[in-house]
């Protein structure tokens, strides 16, 4: 699963980027776009560029700089790219995107951000009908549906496939003639459109446009498909109207997205500041300093400090070169890994009552270790504040998460969690406070399934999920 056993965090599965421009070095533009999206996936990366006839593909494991040592060299005007978080079992080069296929309708390269909830059933049917799969990704279901579609054009084939899949999917696809962007009917994952001087770009987040000096135009709507070619940009609503029900993942604002992005018109940075202000309004703790667990809680901690007048301090220093591990550690190894990544500063925390802010608690293991570390460094009291409600349910819409029984808030009260992590106080931001923080997006347009179990699209059973992970 895309869960970091050291830092007790969920992770976004991936980021996607695409370019259509006849005047620029497309491969370089895709590379820099992916570089800006590196936070959305650090285990593999891939770039596919095309001139409409041939496709040049480069991909590899690791960070972008490790995965792609040389850019593809084909003279091209279209390209798509992908960065991905892999899982323990799917650390396989065959699963690196974009997926490129040649079929009777032409050629396509597909980059997918999200998770299909009906992929297993479709895959079984396709295999029964003779399809052969080369990877264990649900994304390969999409390319098979496109290839088998009876529609006349590649764009119509893509729309036909999109109507058959369910769950979370933001797609960036190159065909022989066009760059295509598709967002699922719920809009679980973000996707936006930008403009270069002579072309257009698609991205999971707007922050990637700044890297190539592209202008943000708008977010792609749920259920929408945009087609970019030499005629410009065309838009169509491919989804049936009754299936469009916007439910953007609220965790994009809490943790996943980069602070300098805007999603559905709402600044991620301002939203996180608001979360900190709402936390202060709900707690009114009397403390000496406000701190974050870097980096995910930092902006909310700044918001808390500004609202309260309590000074913000950096009492935990992060080692940015410690890397990431998928080894399932025992308690001793986990504590060592946390100490390798974070170090408490006695001269900052000694004798202090500390408001400590993080974005979420998944299993509670790391929070307890950090509280222990701060108290060993001389902290007097720790008031733990979480800038989201308690996570009680798994996510099935693009974040591979723990099964519910492994989520500490699913089986423990807040007081029990406080005692488990040995904090003096513990407070989770209320759903109402979170909605006030994300004030630019209506509550009805946000997905809170990981907090309240309200899954708007049918999700697989745990048995089906187990089959999926065995495949991976």
Where do the PLM segments sit?
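Flexible loop/turn segments at secondary-structure boundaries
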Residues: 26, 87-88, 118, 188-189, ...
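Generic beta-strand/beta-sheet core signal
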Residues: 111, 174, 182-183, 194, ...
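Short, glycine/charge-rich flexible loops or terminal/linker lids adjacent to PRPP-binding catalytic cores
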Residues: 309-354, 364-365, 392-398
